[in-house]
Amino acid sequence: MKKDPREHVILIVEDEDAIRLTLRDYLKKKGWNVLVASDGVGAIKILLDNEVDVIITDYRMSVLGGDYWIKFLHTFLSDKKIIITSGFLNPEFDIPFKILYKPFDYSELETFILRELGE
């Protein structure tokens, strides 16, 4: 039987507190299971302890962000659905994931999530 989309677990990786917390609250109100991390290192700890279906991550973060974070995701988590959010991306670096440019509407992000899950 197909899993209800809202049963999937979403990990938000965002270093800006206001964005991370309001996005978490928005998705939880919509019925999603949400985990949060403020940087790539925190995300790795969460990923070691939890089964995550979708990762929504900022590109530019002060701790394990940018190109190295993208390389890590591509190398070790290519089986996950990953959405990159950013106001700035390195144009010389190929990003193999869906990209949602900031600022974005939270409902637009939810549409991205549903598409990634094949809904």
Per-range role (PLM):
Residues 58:
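Active-site residues of response regulator receiver
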Residues 16-35:
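Two-component/phosphorelay signaling modules centered on CheY-like receiver
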Residues 36-45, 66:
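Helix N-cap/capping motif at the beta->alpha junctions
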Residues 1-9, 105-119:
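Non-catalytic signal-transmission and effector/linker regions of two-component phosphorelay proteins
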Residues 61:
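Receiver (REC) domain active-site loop signature in two-component systems and cognate sites
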Residues 102:
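A Lys-centered signature of the CheY-like receiver
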